[in-house]
C-alpha cells in the first residue's frame, strides 16, 4: 500500500512513468530465492527506489538491495516510512518518513486505513 500511495503521488505531481513492483522475500530465510512481480528486464538500466515500511534490523532492506544489484541500474535509492536505527547491517534509507528512537525490545507496527492513511504504533 505504501508504494501504491507513493506511485499515485508521483503520477500526480510529475510526468515520470512509474512502474510498481512487489518484492517477495522470505523473512525467515532471506537467503532463499527472492522474486519480483515484474521481470528483471523491466528494471534493468532504470532508476529504482526500494521501499519498506519499517527499517529495524535492516535484514529485509539489505537482502532486497542485494537482489537488485544483480542487474545494472541507472540509479538506486531506498525509502522507509519508519526508521528505527537498530541496524545489524550497513544499510541506510535515503528517504525517511520518520526516525524513532526506540529500544530494541519495542515493536513498531504500521497499518493502512481504508482511506489510504498510514498509522504507526509503538508497542
Regions found by a protein language model. Name each.
Residues 1-123:
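PRPP-associated nucleotide enzymes
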Amino acid at each position: 500500500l505504501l508504494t501504491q500511495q507513493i506511485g499515485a503521488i508521483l503520477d500526480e505531481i510529475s510526468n515520470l512513468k512509474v512502474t510498481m513492483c512487489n518484492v517477495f522475500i522470505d523473512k525467515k530465510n532471506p537467503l532463499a530465492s527472492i522474486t519480483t512481480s515484474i521481470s528483471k528486464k523491466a528494471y534493468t538500466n532504470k532508476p529504482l527506489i526500494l521501499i519498506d515500511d519499517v527499517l529495524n534490523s535492516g535484514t529485509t532492506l539489505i537482502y532486497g538491495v542485494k537482489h537488485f544489484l544483480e542487474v545494472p541500474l541507472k540509479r538506486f535509492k531506498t525509502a522507509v516510512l519508519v526508521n528505527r536505527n537498530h541496524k545489524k547491517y550497513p544499510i541506510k534509507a535515503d528517504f525517511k518518513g520518520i526516525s524513532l528512537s526506540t529500544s530494541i525490545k519495542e515493536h513498531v507496527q504500521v497499518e493502512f486505513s481504508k482511506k489510504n492513511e498510514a498509522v504507526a504504533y509503538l508497542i
